[in-house]
Amino acid sequence: MSESSASALQLGRPSRQPAVHPENLSLDASCFSSPPVNFLQELPSYRSIARRRTTVHSRDKQSGTLLKSTDSYSSQLEDRIAENLSSQSLRNYALNISEKRRLRDIQETQMKYLSEWDQWKRYSSKSWKRFLEKAREMTTHLELWREDIRSIEGKFGTGIQSYFSFLRFLVLLNLVIFLIIFMLVLLPILLTKYKITNSSFVLIPFKDTDIQCTVYPVSSSGLIYFYSYIIDLLSGTGFLEETSLFYGHYTIDGVKFQNFTYDLPLAYLISTIAYLALSLLWIVKRSVEGFKINLIRSEEHFQSYCNKIFAGWDFCITNRSMADLKHSSLRYELRADLEEERIRQKIAERTSEETIRIYSLRLFLNCIVLAVLGACFYAIYVATVFSQEHMKKEIDKMVFGENLLILYLPSIVITLANFITPMIFAKIIRYEDYSPGFEIRLTILRCVFMRLATICVLVFTLGSKITSCDDDTCDLCGYNQKLYPCWETQVGQEMYKLMIFDFIIILAVTLFVDFPRKLLVTYCSSWKLIQCWGQQEFAIPDNVLGIVYGQTICWIGAFFSPLLPAIATLKFIIIFYVKEWSLLYTCRPSPRPFRASNSNFFFLLVLLIGLCLAIIPLTISISRIPSSKACGPFTNFNTTWEVIPKTVSTFPSSLQSFIHGVTSEAFAVPFFMIICLIMFYFIALAGAHKRVVIQLREQLSLESRDKRYLIQKLTEAQRDTRN
């Protein structure tokens, strides 16, 4: 053998020493050999690292770590894995069967030398984890609409599937909100009303209240036409106004049980705070989970392709139909990735003239969007003022159609604005040249600003009418008692009308627009007008905004109408089946697919915006606007929030001092500073973690280059050997 061949073989020998993670290492020490230092310095990874090091000493130190004895490394690996066997299963390690058996033998050997107490702890820990795994598997089978959502994912992709998963989350959220209100407010009243327990009502005494402020006109009696019941059912007036559906029904101070008195005003306020806090925590928790997934998947696009192609298939699938669904789902995800890659390449290839042109066009189109929003807000304001001024004056003189039109005028204008503006925004955004994912997010932002701002305009208009009047009733009662004797109930009626009318519009559009359009496209496809119209696409931004809009109404209205979450739950359940039927039979898949990882996080972010906007009018209503003196549980308080100081005054003096100290400015300012410091710490920690992730990604890239270099050297050595 020539000297060059021997040298080449020596160079080829280190091919068995690539940079491998510990979990991929073989435990056989004979598989390792100590390569020369000079050869390691020829690796691309070493050269890249050497350029970054400032001293030779650090490089030598790093080289020394690479030259550790493989025997000691192998034994350290065995010890480390054996120590972790108590907390993790062997199946979690990327080892072959023989090595897993070897580790299992090590585990059994270690168990013999443990005390009975340690053996029992390890055995109970394993049993508990096995039980949790089985319970987790069982709960996945109990998920609401699990099979329906998986079928939608396979046929239409993960983007549309994320909408239905989001709808399922809102169903569960509203159900929990209703249970909170039911347990804290409705259940004590029902137990007393139907004599289930030995309890009685404590009626509210009207103290220091002017008699004029306590007047609450009763609904007209006598001959009532049949259509009046329909109006009452659709608007929440008449017979529904006096039921437990609205705030004005709860005119009791408490429920007296055998040993204590249940404070209903306090429970009513606590239920409101509880459902808002629960909604906030639940949404933030799900948003953080979605943000983690979004952050991981958005780092490296090539890695996403590799994961889907080489590791995307679920080999546990044995059913033919489920295999087809999984195949379709992977195809849609790959199409979404390729479409986004095409948009990125197109953006990268733009010239400076094209960039200036597209940004100028976007600026002009955004001015049009702002003009449309301003016109809608003004129309809602005018409609609300007109409806409130004519509702009490002339409603008894009107016929059925005029009566219903006056009652529903704000809801009609809001619904028309919500129906027209998304179509305008969808037409506008086509000329702005964004990626499919960003198109959806920007359209949702515009529509959410439109839809949620319309609710804010309505509530602001109602608030201005409630707190302003021409006579002396505002000075006497604190609000416009003549027009709004029980203003909380009337705000609840407006929220009720918005929810009912929104539900009617969703059903009407599906049954009388989407379904006939499908029939025309199917049986009259030769007509040019029908060809231009085309088959309906499932518009995710519009549908998401629809349910976020409905949920925001529910959050605002639950204080004024305690049963509104139950109505919202039934509404969303029906919407799920209606939208599923519409998707399967009247819609076609979108020609521009998009990924769901971004959508899930963004849907929750939009929902969080809706929750924040709902908290603002509720906070003002509870803390600023005087409570009605003619109805509701807070007639003895100037504002709803006054029930909290009254309750605190009944506590022991030491507890009162503690609460006053915690809520004082002397505590709030240092607490806020500490929170800011903690937040800055976590921001810095997140930045450090991100830098580590970048370094690890670079290390993975360098390892692949090392492997290519070693394969090249091995090929050269084999060629020299043959020669």
Curated annotation (Swiss-Prot):
Glycan attachment points: 24, 84, 96, 259, 638
Cytoplasmic side of membrane: 190-219, 285-362, 426-494, 577-601, 687-723
Gene Ontology MF term list: ion channel inhibitor activity; mechanosensitive monoatomic ion channel activity
Region of interest (Disordered), residue spans: 1-21, 51-70
Alphabetically ordered keywords of this record: Glycoprotein, Membrane, Phosphoprotein, Transmembrane, Transmembrane helix
Pfam families associated with the record: TMC (PF07810)
Name under which the protein is recorded: Transmembrane channel-like protein 7
Bilayer topology: Multi-pass membrane protein
PANTHER family the UniProt entry points to: TRANSMEMBRANE CHANNEL-LIKE PROTEIN 7, TRANSMEMBRANE CHANNEL-RELATED
GO biological process terms, semicolon-separated: sensory perception of mechanical stimulus
Subunit structure: Interacts with PIEZO2; the interaction inhibits PIEZO2-conducted mechanically activated currents.
Compartment(s): Membrane
Keyword Lipid metabolism: no
Residue numbers carrying Phosphoserine: 89
